[in-house]
């Protein structure tokens, strides 16, 4: 089984691309979805113990947690020390299931793939990319997003140009959905030797 690592800076279209891989029959694991599950599950008491006042009714309040760690590298390291091992456990379970299912290709969607060294655990890296103006427009349209938040997030992420230079495949997400589906189908066909499953 070939494991693809999908990554890219915020607002570049990772979620859309991951959904299209899934449509094409590729099992997909999302680190972000795992974090959401963990924040309302087993990570919540650990985060409350590390950052008191950030959990309400057993669920992490992401806004309060963001305020507790923004601009504080040591606090971010503490948070990652709690969350990353749990996310890795979920990823390992996904890989075992995908292998068992007989999948030729599986995809792990990890926003901080390079930043956390996770590229060493995948066979090929797929980076989603779009021009900076499109990225900023997409991100600032999100509820609760501000220039300050975007700046803080981008400071933690390796620049887009470097990600592209380290990728095996680059998906240009600035065009139409059909164009993105075509790019994804080409990757799947090239790696598996079989046409991608019909995508709508």
UniProtKB/Swiss-Prot annotation:
Compartments, as annotated in UniProt: Cytoplasm
Pathway(s): Cofactor biosynthesis; coenzyme A biosynthesis; CoA from (R)-pantothenate: step 5/5
GO cellular component: cytoplasm
Gene Ontology molecular-function annotations: ATP binding; dephospho-CoA kinase activity
Biological processes per GO annotation: coenzyme A biosynthetic process
Residues noted as binding ATP in the record, renumbered to the chain: 11-16
Record-linked Pfam families: CoaE (PF01121)
PROSITE patterns: DPCK
Coiled coil: none
Disulfide bonds: none
The entry's keywords: ATP-binding, Coenzyme A biosynthesis, Cytoplasm, Kinase, Nucleotide-binding, Transferase
Family indicated by similarity: Belongs to the CoaE family.
NCBIfam families given in the database record: dephospho-CoA kinase (TIGR00152)
UniProt-listed HAMAP family: Dephospho_CoA_kinase
Function field: Catalyzes the phosphorylation of the 3'-hydroxyl group of dephosphocoenzyme A to form coenzyme A.
Protein name according to UniProt: Dephospho-CoA kinase
Gene from which this protein is expressed: coaE
């Amino acid at each position: 089984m070939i494991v693809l690592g999908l990554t890219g800076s915020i607002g570049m279209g990772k979620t859309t691309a991951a959904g299209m891989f899934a449509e094409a029959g590729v099992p997909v694991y999302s680190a972000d979805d795992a974090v959401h599950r963990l924040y309302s599950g087993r990570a919540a008491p650990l985060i409350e113990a590390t950052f008191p006042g950030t959990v309400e009714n057993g669920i992490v309040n992401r806004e309060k947690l963001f305020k507790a760690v923004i601009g504080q590298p040591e606090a971010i390291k503490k948070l990652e020390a709690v969350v990353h091992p749990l996310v890795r456990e979920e990823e390992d379970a996904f890989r075992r299931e995908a292998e068992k299912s007989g999948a030729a290709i599986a995809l792990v969607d990890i926003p901080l793939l390079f930043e956390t060294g996770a590229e060493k655990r995948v066979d090929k890296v797929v980076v989603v990319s779009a021009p900076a103006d499109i990225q900023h427009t997409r991100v600032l349209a999100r509820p609760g997003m501000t220039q300050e938040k975007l700046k803080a997030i981008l400071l933690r992420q390796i620049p887009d140009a470097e990600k592209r230079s380290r990728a095996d495949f680059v998906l240009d997400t600035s065009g139409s959905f059909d164009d993105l589906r075509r790019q994804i189908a080409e990757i799947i066909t090239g790696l598996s030797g079989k046409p991608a499953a019909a995508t709508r």
